[in-house]
Structure formats: C-alpha cells, structure tokens
C-alpha cells in the first residue's frame, strides 16, 4: 500500500491486524506516490491526503473509483514557547516558515488558505517561507530542529510529536476541506485483498486506528 505520510502512525498500528496478508506500507507525499503509479509502480492500494489525486488517477484508468475514508484539519504548528498566536503573526518580518511544496496536498491547502486573506497579507506570509517540503514529515522536521518558526501541517501530525509543538488554529472561515481518499490500483497483484483493506479504512481496525489518531470520519 502507498499512502500519504500523514497516515504513518495510524496505518502502521492497524496493518498487522489485517487477516490473510502481510501488509507492506510505503509512505511519501501524495503527489510523489501518484507519480510513481503513473511511471508503472503498482501498489495494491493508493491513499492520498486529498480527493483530487485519486480522482485524476481514476480518470486516467489507473485507479478504481476512489473512496473518501477520513478527514483532517490544517493547522499552524509552532514550538511550545513560540509567541505566535494567530495566522496574522506569520506575516511579521523575520519569521521563518516551512510549508508543503505546491504539488503536495498540504502545500495546496496552505496556498488555498493564504489566497483567501485580505490585501497583501497572504503574499507577506509567503515571503517568509524558507522551506517548501515534499511532505508533512519534512515540515515537522524543520520545526523540531529549530529551522522554522512555524509551519502548516495537519492536526494529527502535531499530536504525534507530543509536547514539543503546539497548535494555532486557523479562523473557521478559512479552514480548507481536508478529505483523504483511496482506491485500488489497476493491475494490483492482490485486487481482492486490496478491496478488503480499502473497506477496512471506513469500517474496521484501520478505521478505528485513524479515529484514535485524531482523523475525522468522511
């Protein structure tokens, strides 16, 4: 299975409970995994941190009809002792920000939020970006290493890190719709088991693991 890196903890915990098969997981940015499928890599299941990439692969004949199986929340993550209290604080001069690259869902969601800000506030925040990362793990890494003052990640990512980071919520009108979607890859070696695992993302051990990790229901 190829899955967005933000699902690492949840899927690592539930995969061993899948009956009848040894589930091997590969985590990376959703866009990178989609590119691999387009280049001929054939995992049995593909799960992305948005609904757009699975829909594209389905349209290209590379993925079964996608199923929405979880939701998440885009937030600002900052070090525990940070003075950042709001989205507007990120526009201050001297701030060092880490965000997702434009092609990865977390980066796309971030730019969607910034595009909704009034005046030049979004541009001023983007001017403080020092790092465009390929996945949420890269953003969290910059924060925990002290290389960034703030970053846009998913709520579940901050929960995994523990007390070293805290969450700054986005204003409700700006929150993007973060929906996770998955499908069975055309040409999968184990299509029946792949569909069974896919079902388990919405009702089963993996659905329970996702809920425990803080993901919402679709």
What are the roles of these predicted feature ranges?
Residues 62:
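Active-site surface patch of divalent metal-dependent phosphodiester/phosphate bond hydrolases
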Residues 22-31:
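A short beta-strand-loop structural module common to alpha/beta enzyme folds
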């Amino acid at each position: 299975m190829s899955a967005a890196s933000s699902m690492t903890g949840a899927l690592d915990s539930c995969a061993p409970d899948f009956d009848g098969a040894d589930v091997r997981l590969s985590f990376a940015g959703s866009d990178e995994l989609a590119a691999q499928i387009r280049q001929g890599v054939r995992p049995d299941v593909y799960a992305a941190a948005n609904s757009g990439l699975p829909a594209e692969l389905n349209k290209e004949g590379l993925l079964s009809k996608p199923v929405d199986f979880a939701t998440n929340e885009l937030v600002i993550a900052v070090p525990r002792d940070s003075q950042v209290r709001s989205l507007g604080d990120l526009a201050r001069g001297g701030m060092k920000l880490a965000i997702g690259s434009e092609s990865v869902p977390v980066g796309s969601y971030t730019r969607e939020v910034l595009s909704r800000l009034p005046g030049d506030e979004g541009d001023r925040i983007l001017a403080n970006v020092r790092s465009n990362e390929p996945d949420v793990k890269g953003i969290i890494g910059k924060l925990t290493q002290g290389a960034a003052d703030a970053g846009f990640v998913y709520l579940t990512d901050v929960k995994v890190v523990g007390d070293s980071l805290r969450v700054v919520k986005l204003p409700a009108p700006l929150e993007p719709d973060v929906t996770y979607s998955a499908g069975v890859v055309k040409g999968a070696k184990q299509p029946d088991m792949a569909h069974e695992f896919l079902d388990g993302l919405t009702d089963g051990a993996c659905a329970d693991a996702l809920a425990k990790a803080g993901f919402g229901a679709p």
